[in-house]
Amino acid sequence: LGEEPGFEGVRPAIGLNYGSTKLGIIGTDERLEAVAISESTNLAQFLQKMAPKYSARILVTGTLLEQIPDARSRYHLRWIGFVSLSATEALEPIYDCFDGDTPEERAWKAETKEQFERGVALYCARSYYEARKMFIEVLKSSYQDFAAKEYLFLCDRRLNQEDTGAQGYLVRY
């Protein structure tokens, strides 16, 4: 999609996570509905909504990647940081799986992957000035990288305010 005739501009997004889920049927005699309830499905749904903001079509959790043998060598992945899970206060690593992107997107993500991930690591370590420099370099090669733009914005915001304590994550869920 997005490249097929009649689907220009359509950019589907997918969020993938791993965990237990409870399935059931709810409703009344007049109307029944199937429901999936779990933190896993809620996080996957959150990632799906988050994907376009970061130039991603497929966002996956580190928890899912741990379940797939050789995932890091089988797929084109770019670490985009952590999501802070408010229910547990844990940090979940999030990856952009760019195998589903256009050839042009795959090329610039592969080309800037090392610099981008270094910038993310610096941001997580609260080295905002150094992280900012990395994201500027990424944007010189790929100005359309929304994730790098978002991190640049976050670095600027952090540099222009007093340190508010440990952040180390991209977004809170």
Regions found by a protein language model. Give the residues of each.
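Cytosolic regulatory/linker segments at or just downstream of nucleotide-handling modules
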Residues: 21, 52-125, 130, 136-137, ...
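Catalytic core of nucleotidyl cyclases, primarily class III adenylyl/guanylyl cyclases
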Residues: 1-39, 63, 69, 88-93
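Structural preference for long, well-ordered alpha-helical segments in enzyme cores
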Residues: 43-44
